[in-house]
């Protein structure tokens, strides 16, 4: 799923939990943080392979997303650190037991990790063979093979893309509507 859609989904879910006291920065950062390493790897790798190594753009894309994404330990680790359900569940459980319930539900880190986890849960069903590694770092290759993809036309992206676009527009419209209403709720 596209990163801006994650931000709108996570914001809407946080607002709908019935509390106005959630740390907005944690929710928003957690909604995009799982994708940030791949942005940096893609930009850095794209510039390096294109302008230092002199590769053609197609060659660069095939190498980065056909080889490095699936086989390079650095790429795998950085991309899955905040995308792995296993890592996020362990972190959330450890934080919960470390802080206790009352502090956990108000914790910036709890909201951040919860937002990363929601991002991951939304990603899993819309990535055919490039989704999060479910059991990383214990298993470095297992991904749920969804029949759907948000970008791959061979896996119904022609359906998923407009659905995601509609979700994005509806949630954005809802947020704008709430902000423009006199009472702001």
Describe the residue ranges of each PLM region:
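N-terminal membrane-targeting hydrophobic helices
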Residues: 1-185
């Amino acid at each position: 799923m596209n990163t801006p859609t994650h931000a709108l989904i996570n914001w809407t879910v946080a607002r709908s939990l019935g509390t106005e006291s959630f740390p907005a920065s944690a929710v928003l950062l957690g909604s995009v943080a799982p994708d940030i390493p791949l942005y940096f790897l893609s930009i850095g790798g794209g510039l390096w392979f294109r302008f230092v190594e002199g590769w053609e753009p197609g060659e660069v894309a095939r190498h980065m997303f056909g080889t490095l994404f699936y086989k390079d330990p650095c790429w795998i680790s950085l991309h899955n650190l905040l995308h792995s359900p296993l890592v996020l569940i362990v972190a959330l459980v450890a934080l919960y037991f470390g802080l206790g319930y009352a502090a956990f539900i108000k914790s910036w880190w709890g909201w951040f990790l919860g937002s990363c986890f929601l991002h991951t849960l939304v990603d899993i069903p819309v990535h055919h063979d490039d989704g999060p590694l479910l059991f990383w770092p214990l298993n470095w290759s297992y991904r749920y093979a969804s029949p759907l993809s948000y970008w791959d036309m061979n896996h119904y992206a022609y359906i998923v893309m407009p659905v995601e676009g509609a979700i994005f527009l509806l949630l954005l419209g809802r947020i704008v509507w709430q902000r423009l209403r006199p009472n702001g709720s």
